[in-house]
Amino acid sequence: VSEYEFPNNIESYDGYLLTGSPVSVHDDYDWIKMLSDFIGKANNKNKPIVGVCFGHQLIAKYFGGVVGNNEKGWMIGNFPLEIEINFPWMKKKVNTTDLYHFNKERVIKLPEGAISFASSEDYPYYAYTIGDNIVCLQGHPEQPKRAMYNFLEVTKAVLSEKDIEKANSCIGSGKSNSVVWAQWIMDFFGSHFPPKN
């Protein structure tokens, strides 16, 4: 979408996944405005939508939530999360999990009607739902450890030595439960498309 390529018709696809981005949801790019409009149109058609990182923040902002800087600055690495709600569509039920993330902004106020289902010390609204067709999360279930180190390498110019040292430590700590989150995303989409006989 950053190259201004959008589906010609909302009905072209059964559902939509909004990924991460190197830009901020507050940046003044026309494609961000177009994507925001697209979110509204897809929601009006009750399309299942998943937002990840940038997508998570943009969806919150579109529906009236607030996105702002994390007081601790860059949060890079693998961090523990509390799972507050296990929805019926989640095939695997857990109370805690870990996930990689790479960002310095976060959702600081949820849109009206949104329900938070995962949080951490630094992210009270790490993951949330809106209605029964939108699920959003701050972290990156699609990224393995090596990708996180690659991200760190290409962004070193904008990071302090302290940020880099902390990131290296956090990326290497523990084991990300990315498979659990990836499965949840598939479970969510699957709940909207039951198997055909």
PLM region spans:
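Residue-level detector of flexible, active-site-proximal loop/helix-junction positions
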Residues: 2-3, 56, 74, 106, ...
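Amide-donor transfer/coupling interface in amidating biosynthetic enzymes
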Residues: 44, 83-197
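Short clusters of hydrophobic/aromatic residues that line enzyme substrate/ligand-binding pockets
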Residues: 6, 67, 90
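Cysteine-nucleophile active-site neighborhood
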Residues: 19-87
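N-terminal beta1-alpha1 cap of cysteine-dependent amidohydrolase-like domains
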Residues: 1-47, 162-197
